[in-house]
């Protein structure tokens, strides 16, 4: 689901990339929004909605939170757009937020999962990070069954309201 696009096909604000697998593989306990340090061509490529964060993860390096293994392909429109597509990218958070999340990761054995990359109303790129507890296989099956039941229930409610 992409955000609002301009005439040039670029996303002005809204969703640029989503990690649906992250919400399935982890029980998300808490979320926060963090800024991300990007170069110009990376932002343009991100605005085209070409990024992938399915295999991405966030971790601590030198007291800061970094996003690893996210894929932002090179922007084809420019000549000087040479950058590493899978380079680690620094996330911008307050010190207290960093301490809170790193403490939770070390205590509870949780993980920092990037859930999506989006552009806010001001056009700034943001990453939604979730503090996730890993799910076991039976938990995943339960989540699938619950989701299917909600879908079937909504379908039954819709169909029962029709007059034949």
Swiss-Prot record:
Gene Ontology molecular function terms on file: RNA binding
Keyword Cell membrane applies: no
GO terms of biological process kind: trans-translation
Main subcellular location of this protein, as a coarse class: cytoplasm
Cell compartment(s), UniProt: Cytoplasm
Electron transport as UniProt keyword: no
Gene3D superfamilies: 2.40.280.10
Protein's job: Required for rescue of stalled ribosomes mediated by trans-translation. Binds to transfer-messenger RNA (tmRNA), required for stable association of tmRNA with ribosomes. tmRNA and SmpB together mimic tRNA shape, replacing the anticodon stem-loop with SmpB. tmRNA is encoded by the ssrA gene; the 2 termini fold to resemble tRNA(Ala) and it encodes a 'tag peptide', a short internal open reading frame. During trans-translation Ala-aminoacylated tmRNA acts like a tRNA, entering the A-site of stalled ribosomes, displacing the stalled mRNA.
Name used for this protein in its record: SsrA-binding protein
Higher taxonomy: Bacteria, Pseudomonadati, Pseudomonadota, Alphaproteobacteria, Acetobacterales
Gene: smpB
């Amino acid at each position: 689901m992409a955000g609002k696009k301009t005439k040039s096909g670029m996303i002005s604000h809204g969703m640029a990339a989503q990690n649906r697998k992250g919400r399935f593989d982890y029980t998300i306990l808490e979320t926060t929004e963090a800024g991300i340090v990007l170069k110009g061509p990376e932002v343009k490529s991100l605005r085209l909605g070409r990024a992938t964060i399915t295999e991405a993860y966030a971790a601590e390096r030198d007291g800061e939170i970094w996003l690893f293994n996210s894929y932002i392909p090179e922007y084809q429109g420019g000549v000087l757009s040479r950058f590493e597509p899978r380079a680690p990218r620094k996330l911008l958070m307050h010190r207290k937020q960093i301490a809170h999340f790193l403490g939770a990761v070390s205590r509870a054995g949780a993980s920092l999962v990037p859930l999506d990359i989006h552009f806010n109303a001001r056009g700034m790129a943001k990453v939604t990070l979730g503090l996730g507890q890993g799910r076991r296989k039976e938990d995943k099956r339960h989540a699938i069954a619950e989701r299917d039941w909600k879908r079937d229930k909504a379908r039954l409610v819709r169909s029962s309201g029709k007059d034949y």
